[in-house]
Amino acid sequence: MAQKWQTISELAAETSRKVTHSPEEWCRFLTTAARFYKAYDFDDQLLIYAQKPNATACADMPTWNNKMRRWVNAGSTAIALIRKGYGGKPYLDYVHDVADTHPVRGGKDPWLWKLTEENREPVMERLRDTFGIDGSGDLGDLLMETAEKLVQESYGEYLPDLLYEREDSFLEELDDFNVEVLFRNTLRASVQYAVLSLSLIHISEP
């Protein structure tokens, strides 16, 4: 078990290095992470991306069996996630993607949000009303502006942590103002990419 945990820990570290050193790899990670923004944190998203980047809905076996009435397919590979137990001791937990399950009697399919022609206009109207966005741009423009507003409102909560942790990184060479500008622009572009990816609007990798 200790050896398995070490392997997964190393996988997480290597994946983190890869996605933060390559714009293309970061975009591919965002495409996966966008599908799990609500249920899993960044560390989990990294490991899901590393082990099954095409996953769409993940849950542990009890959830699939008891709540969804779906059995995990024989021979399928679980996705290992790192958890902390009593006293902070790490251990591995396992989840399975819906593609590796099948329904039994009374089985349910997970609800996966998707943009359709039927809900496109209601989505646009809701975004305009919620975020006070004027104009008659298309959905892509509306999502871009919404993401920019959200980032502008929230990036300041995370900036102090970044400034504190910048030692021994390339950010160390920048003053506070330029770190802030770089962080805000990177965060905005990442959120926009993830939102557009989830909405299946065509986007090009940088």
Mark where each language-model region is.
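N-terminal accessory/interface modules of nucleic-acid-binding and processing proteins
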Residues: M1-S204
